[in-house]
Amino acid sequence: MKPDIHPNYRVVVFHDTSANAYFTIGSTIRTERTITLNGEEYPYVTVDVSSESHPFYTGKQKTLSQEGSTARFQKKFGRFIGNK
């Protein structure tokens, strides 16, 4: 294995700013910012969306359409296909 070609893997704190949640995860991301969490200093990265705030994971997602593609097609073009 060649030396100095692999990124530095370390523990990083990700901060979900929309949910104000902190995640301590191993990562190779580069950042100059640091934060002290639980008495230790870690590299710090902010994120807009995480599993704490994404609607899919929180269960607050909206369903846009319940009908299938066939029903939408019939509604749109059914009058043209109707009687032969």
Curated annotation (Swiss-Prot):
Keyword Transcription regulation: no
Assembly: Part of the 50S ribosomal subunit.
Ribonucleoprotein listed as a keyword: yes
GO MF annotation terms: structural constituent of ribosome
Superkingdom as given in the UniProt entry: Bacteria
Alphabetical list of InterPro entries matching this protein: Ribosomal_bL28/bL31-like_sf, Ribosomal_bL31, Ribosomal_bL31_B, Ribosomal_bL31_sf
Protein family (similarity comment): Belongs to the bacterial ribosomal protein bL31 family. Type B subfamily.
NCBIfam families, A to Z: L31, PRK01678.1
Keywords associated with the record: Ribonucleoprotein, Ribosomal protein
Protein name: Large ribosomal subunit protein bL31B
CC per GO annotation: ribonucleoprotein complex; ribosome
Coiled-coil stretches noted in the UniProt entry, renumbered to this chain: none
One Gene Ontology term from the biological process aspect of the record: translation
Gene: rpmE2
Source organism of the structure: Photorhabdus laumondii subsp. laumondii (strain DSM 15139 / CIP 105565 / TT01)
Disulfide bond sites: none
